[in-house]
Amino acid sequence: MELPAVNLKVILLVHWLLTTWGCLVFSSSYAWGNFTILALGVWAVAQRDSIDAIGMFLGGLVATIFLDIIYISIFYSSVATGDTGRFGAGMAILSLLLKPFSCCLVYHMHRERGGELPLRPDFFGPSQEHSAYQTIDSSSDAAADPFASLENKGQAVPRGY
């Protein structure tokens, strides 16, 4: 099944609008959690070639699914008494229901940018960013004996006592 081509800006706009309406009734921790992840989404829009930006946005969306379940289950009974409370809670629930679909779309964008699902032991290892620079820890003969070139040029070589 082919996923529809949805712009990341549309995903951000929908979740921003639903989060804003959800903030009418839920605590500030709901707002901080969701708006922080939306800021990561803005970073992913600004840097179109960054795998880390879209990966962090994807991970944040997954995390907010669990956080929103906790927020809604704890505070729903106390806030859904009036019309405004039911509206805000409904928008937060709608945002929660759309997040798994958004995660699928963002994961598809992550794969298009060259990312892969980090299910390896070196998950917290080096970044997957592609650049023209060589790594410092590349193996070469100069790394094995750093003072070999100094002896050949007649320069003073530091000696251990």
From Swiss-Prot:
Residues 1-26, 75-86 are extracellular. One of its GO terms (biological process) is response to hypoxia. The modification Phosphoserine is found at residues 127, 138. The modification Phosphothreonine is found at residue 135. GO terms for cellular component: cell cortex; cytoplasmic vesicle membrane; endoplasmic reticulum membrane; Golgi membrane; plasma membrane. Its main location: endoplasmic reticulum. Residues 48-53, 108-161 are cytoplasmic. It is a multi-pass membrane protein. Appears to be a negative regulator of type-1 angiotensin II receptor-mediated signaling by regulating receptor internalization as well as mechanism of receptor desensitization such as phosphorylation. Also induces a decrease in angiotensin II-stimulated transcriptional activity. May play a role of negative regulator in cardiomyocyte hypertrophy induced by angiotensin II through an inhibition of p38 mitogen-activated protein kinase pathway. This is Type-1 angiotensin II receptor-associated protein. It comes from Mus musculus (Mouse).
